[in-house]
Amino acid sequence: MSVPADAPILTSRAMRDAEAACAASGTSLSELMDRAGAAVADTAWRMAAGAPVLILCGPGNNGGDGYVAARLLRERGANVRVAALAPPTTDLAKAARAKWAGAVEPIDETLAAEPVVVDALFGVGLTRPLASNLTGQLQALAFRRVIAVDVPSGVDADGKHDWVPPLPAHVTVALGALKPAHVLLPAAQHCGRVLLAGVGIACDATIRSLPRPRASAPGVTSHKFNRGMMLVRSGAMPGAAALAAAAGLRAGAGYAVLSGANTAPLSAIIVEDGANYRERLGDKRVGAVVIGPGYPAGMALDRDVASAIDSAKPLVLDAAAIDAALPRLRGGGVTAILTPHEGEFVRAFPGAEGGKLERALAAARATGSVVIY
């Protein structure tokens, strides 16, 4: 999966509000649909490279985008067919359908596929999984190059439900802004490469996609000390901590100390039995501390987490170390990076509500920390 960097991310409700605000400012919704359809047509034109295109249109405005794309592709001379699930039900989609002069085939078991399929069936308004009979019909078209309009049909745009689409996309054309489904697993794995089409909607988004991190190459005067020391505290199961130490080296740390283990996957990792862990925390060369991977809950972990917090070093907390640190994180004055998986998150933040974005934000605010979830 691939998404553009520094792009706005809006929930389906926020997207509808942005569209309404755009219309109130003087841009008609039909103009927005024309722009969306043009973006889809451009993508299909490039991907098809002269091959025939099949556009699947739903009854709503997502289908309207599909009818616009079909018309524009036909005007360019493309070999394009349209198949519809049902007649249009919105005024915008009806108007777009009326401008399409070609035939409209039914979506059933006799529908023949083309090398490129545009999925304009259901967009951000989907509130339930697709019907099983439609799923079966669409799965027969899945072994093609699929372009999804906004989100693959069958995906929950807000990423709250783990619905599996029958037509996973190779490319998804996100309209106006990214949606949570484009960046959150498992939905994101069905979106393929995400292209953001700016259709003229002003997006006052407080959530944006991050650019890929760029690590600078070591300079001629670089050495292990000025590139930073990483201290990883290991528990009774050192495998995960050893992997964290190895990842730190690969990410650019000058060197890594694995405290509390007797082996490491890389010879470059310094292995210590952990007896001098607190002394290591006082080492001015230590630029970051990682604690929690493979470290079971208990008094030993509680003590080691408390020592790490007291050191005031930049801190990464994982697994049971998150639980051990929660009282002090919630008390303020302590900042960390928290890396829980789903089960660890639910255990640490059982009252968090909403989708994944809302829950992660609530956890970050409650702890004053960065939450990678």
Label the model's feature ranges.
Residues A96-A101, L111-A120:
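Feature captures the FAD/FMN-dependent oxidoreductase FAD-binding
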Residues E114-V116, L121-I207:
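Internal gly/pro-rich beta-alpha loop/helix module
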Residues M1-L85, V116, A169-V171, A177-I337, ...:
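Small-residue (G/A/S/T)-rich helix-start motifs and N-terminal tracts that mark the onset
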Residues A86-T89, V151-S153, A321:
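Short beta-alpha junction loops
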Residues T90-K99, A264-A268:
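N-terminal beta-loop-helix "entrance" segment that forms/cooperates
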